[in-house]
Amino acid sequence: MAQCSGLPEMAKAYEAAEVEKKWYQYWMEKGYFKPNPDSDKKPFVIIMPPPNVTGELHLGHALTATLEDIMIRWHRMLGEPALWLPGADHAGIAAQVVVERMLAKQGKTRQELGRELFLEKMWEWVNPCRERIRHQHMRLGASCDWDRETFTLDPGPVKAVREIFTNLYQKGLIYRGERIINWCPRCATAVSDLEVDHKDLAGHIWHLRYPLEDGSGFVTVATTRPETMLGDTAVAVHPDDARYTGMVGKNVLLPIMNRRIPVIADEAVDMAFGTGAVKVTPAHDPNDFEMGLRHSLPMITIQNRDTTMNENAGPCSGMTAKACREYVVSELKSLGLLLKIEDYTHSVGHCQRCSAVIEPMVSKQWFVKMEPLAKPALEAVNSGRIQILPERFTKVYQNWMENIRDWCISRQLWWGHRIPVWYCPCGEMIVSKEDPTACPKCGSTKLEQDPDVLDTWFSSGLWPHSTLGWPDQTEDLKRFYPGSVLETAYDIIFFWVARMIVMGIEDMKEVPFRTVYLHGLIRDDKGEKMSKTKGNVIDPLKVIDQYGTDALRFAVTFGTSPGNDSKLGQTKLEAARNFVNKLWNASRFVIMNLGEEKELLPEAGLPLEDRWILSRMNRVTADVIRLMEEFQFGEAQRVLQDFVWGEFCDWYIELAKVRLRDEASVSPRPVLVKVLSTILRLLHPYMPFITEELWSYLRPYLPKSLGETDIIVAPFPQADETCFDEQAESIMGSLVEVVRSLRNLRAEHNVEISRYIQANIYAGDMAEVLSNYLGAVETLSRSRPVNILPGHYSGASTATEVVLVLNGIEVVVPMSTMVDLEAEAKRVEAEIAELETQIERLSARLSDTQFLAKAPQAVVDKERTKLEGYIEKVSRLKAV
């Protein structure tokens, strides 16, 4: 039958590009991406992790956007006011580096341009990037409320940043001081501890002799950086180290510099490292810095910010660090103070952005005092007010919070939130939410703002509430804070997640979200991390162009689970594309066979397969809801795919075809509509475009409440337990098992598609029920005639017949109906001969003592397993 005449003819193949453009524009025009203002239900809120403006869309973004869109679309279908607030991050150092490189190609520097003109160049580059990010998310089907889109340098976030900075400063939680920081010489800025990647590098450890001032001997120290000895202000030993008991309190003369420095005792010294005595350079080592504070040691900086040696380096002033090292080692050797050099592998910090070696350096910077802020953030997770998924990351979060250090928030950049601090020539420092016009102390108008900007993560930490209008008490803030779920990658739990919790509780006195869902990384199909150098990067936009958005979404989320990495390769992408095509073809078959009028679902008297598919549909619905509530979106997706392809398409539709050809049969159309409408709604969060397109064709056949609704806002299916039918599932299970066994038998014996096989089915008590489906068994298994008999068959397989023993059913198939027995006998005979040749060869090899002595055990075991397999196969073939 033809489909309803009021509808356009369905295309034979799914045209993704055309469908995606049409429906996304339609959803935007209808305002579906905005939270429903009329709903009295509790809002469901996700604030999008703002992607950096520097980046092209990659698979990580695709996974994030898809998982968040799944949640938003699901909760929208549950009737909740669903808000997904999008945005982008100004990306601080990463963005500035890109623009500076562009200027360098033109022979210009930011210093030559000046701050104002350079920032104009930044905005010229950033604005198109923001447009690109928005367009890329739209192509992914992201149902964000684009009218609420926020950029971290928009006026709202700028106001929020100044508010929190001023508040924390007034509480004594932000301070400016000389502290040891991580200095990136290439980016020319301080970076936080979290922005330093530690890599194990092969190096050396130098043992240096420092002479005691009283001439009584030497103290030998071990160091991996001999050039820093020029800034030493002490030698430290452990107070319990008996080797140095008499030396503590004495002085040594620092070689080359001839500076008198003390021998001190400190419990931080590792007695097992080197000689147990260490040089202390407070200005160039984090541990030494803390030791220097404890012992009031001078802090002598010997390097400039470009890592060349400064005037404090004595004879090495003006040298590079490498040249300085060579000079120091040579000089100590000539003085007889270099005891030995050993190979040594040690951890060296590198800038996460540019990979330059990080230089620990004492510098005047702005810091946040984290310990008082961390306590309530830790309690929020410990008390369960915030749940972290998977649970194992809770321990990671707790450990970091319990050992937190002060956060260096100033960056020597121009692009970002400029620190809201001004300096007056009179010495007054003004911290203000607004630009001051005059010094409150002397009245001077000659104020200079601090040149530094804030760490990008400082503004990102305010994201859940600054995007909703804070510090103003807006209606959005009242309605949508706190958020429901924070979904992001597990690798930024410290960078971003922890800081949002800290800032949210500080500003709002309430947690910023209830659940933290951490997804894993997407690796290639071999489990390798994707990188341009490896050539294994998959461009999601190219995948969309080739296979469509729904296929990409289905592929990136398939097999995912909270916190675990997943694999993605061509095989999975093609499988997702095939599922899209399967869904289209199956739906097209159903819709093209629905006729002109709606058919109502009978209240009773449904055939077995109808009761079975309705029972399975409701069980699958219950499973999907449970799994989605547990954030197991990958598993819910697998359950759905198995049902759609493995039960609805492969079995129910095939059985329905038999009835559609028989006018006397009970019509399967109402059940086809019921199940397909449920499938489309269950799949919509995962595959929004194809489901909306198919829904548009199905709507005329749906009940009025559904037929007048676009699927994006249609009610999400709920399981009806009264439809669970264990009897129907059991009987259909047997029917499916019989057909599948016959299909497998055909495949094993390479039976031509045009050839029918014969079968006797001994079904015991189920014979009468299965007899009602004789035609279906014959059609689906390409078997004819099929005899369904009572009782059971006790015989075994022979050369003339195959006996398949199923669950309480025996299927007997004469070999003559599948193969030419004479030709088959010759084939088996030839196969046995070949196998026996292999057995003879392997037996000889495994009897060879030289082979057994020289070959790896794994190779021997592999050969032995192969031999056993050949022997078992010969035995099986001879038995037949």
Swiss-Prot record:
Binding site for ATP: K532
Protein keywords: Aminoacyl-tRNA synthetase, ATP-binding, Coiled coil, Cytoplasm, Ligase, Nucleotide-binding, Protein biosynthesis
An MF annotation (GO) of this entry: aminoacyl-tRNA deacylase activity
Primary localization class, coarse: cytoplasm
Subcellular location: Cytoplasm
Keyword set includes Protein biosynthesis: yes
Domain of life: Bacteria
Alphabetized InterPro entries for the sequence: aa-tRNA-synth_I_CS, aa-tRNA-synth_Ia, Anticodon_Ia_Val, M/V/L/I-tRNA-synth_anticd-bd, Rossmann-like_a/b/a_fold, tRNA-bd_arm, tRNAsynth_Ia_anticodon-bd, Val-tRNA_synth_C_sf
Short sequence motif 'HIGH' region: positions: 51-61
Motif ('KMSKS' region): 529-533
Catalyzed reactions per annotation: tRNA(Val) + L-valine + ATP = L-valyl-tRNA(Val) + AMP + diphosphate
UniProt cross-references to CDD domains, sorted A to Z: Anticodon_Ia_Val, ValRS_core
GO BP annotation list: valyl-tRNA aminoacylation
Enzyme Commission (EC) number: 6.1.1.9
CC annotations in GO: cytosol
Coiled-coil ranges (or none): 815-854
Family: Belongs to the class-I aminoacyl-tRNA synthetase family. ValS type 1 subfamily.
Comment field on protein domains: ValRS has two distinct active sites: one for aminoacylation and one for editing. The misactivated threonine is translocated from the active site to the editing site.
Oligomeric form and interacting partners: Monomer.
Primary role: Catalyzes the attachment of valine to tRNA(Val). As ValRS can inadvertently accommodate and process structurally similar amino acids such as threonine, to avoid such errors, it has a 'posttransfer' editing activity that hydrolyzes mischarged Thr-tRNA(Val) in a tRNA-dependent manner.
Protein name: Valine--tRNA ligase
UniProt source species: Dehalococcoides mccartyi (strain ATCC BAA-2266 / KCTC 15142 / 195)
